[in-house]
Regions:
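Short, glycine/charge-rich flexible loops or terminal/linker lids adjacent to PRPP-binding catalytic cores
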Residues: 74-124, 131-134
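Active-site-facing substrate-recognition patch
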Residues: 1-63, 203-209
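Hydrophobic Val/Ile/Leu positions in short beta-strands of Rossmann-like dinucleotide-binding domains
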Residues: 69, 125-126
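Conserved acidic residues
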Residues: 65, 121, 151
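A phosphate-binding catalytic loop at a beta-strand-loop-alpha-helix junction
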Residues: 130-139, 143
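PRPP-dependent phosphoribosyltransferase catalytic core
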Residues: 2-10, 140-209
Length: 209
């Protein structure tokens, strides 16, 4: 599977790269025809810092108190907070970086000690990859519960442009991967044609079948 990987560079910054592997993959709520590998961006500080700088440029005029990191984006989130605090409307600000917990029914929650970082705050969602937007929907439900104000959605890769009226600013989009498709399991043409699933995919990575 790995031998099929192709490297894609971000427009305007060749230091920011993702890997894409064509195939048949199953997530919790969809089937997709590409695995988007963001491992280096989420684990390597050099690329994470470059990605954070690129994302921060979009929000220089947006007041942000807190960044909620989803899908292992904490390193990028920390550099993003640093970049936001260096210039623009957030210059000098101590931007918070938090990660929600998932409870027994897969809802995002915050414990009492971190709720104050959300309640009444201007919040930016940072997510690794968006295919259907369902993870964003869960995060938005969480924000409403804790009275946070969503001011933006930032992503490394997104197959959609917006979610419930909020634009998704992504470093990589469907323009970089025009053949990217997502299907419900019942409507997946790869399943219907008998193509076996290559791997199970979640926010941590993939497991071959």
């Amino acid at each position: 599977m790995e031998e099929r990987m192709q490297i894609i560079q971000a427009a305007g910054n060749s230091k920011i790269q993702i890997g894409v592997i064509p195939g048949h993959y199953a997530t919790n709520h969809s089937h997709i025809n590409y695995y988007v590998d963001i491992t280096s961006l989420k684990t390597g500080y050099k690329m994470a810092k470059e990605a954070a700088k690129a994302l921060a440029a979009t929000y220089v005029s947006t007041h942000i108190d807190t960044i909620i990191c989803l899908e292992g984006t904490e390193i990028i989130g920390a550099f993003l907070a640093e970049s936001l605090g260096e210039s623009g409307i957030n210059s000098g600000a101590d931007v918070n970086v938090v990660t929600p917990e998932l409870n027994a029914v897969n809802q995002m929650i915050f414990r009492d000690n971190t709720q104050k970082k959300i309640w009444g705050k201007q919040v930016l969602l940072l997510i690794a990859s968006v295919s259907t937007g369902k993870s964003i929907n869960r995060a938005m439900d969480c924000l409403k519960y804790y009275n946070g104000n969503l001011v933006g959605i930032a992503s490394i890769f997104s197959a959609i442009k917006e979610n419930h009226g909020t634009a998704i600013h992504a470093l990589f989009t469907e323009k970089d991967l025009p053949d990217y498709m997502t299907y419900t399991s019942s409507e997946c043409p790869m399943c219907k044609s008998g193509q076996k699933v290559d791997a199970l995919v979640n926010s941590f990575g993939y497991s071959k079948i």
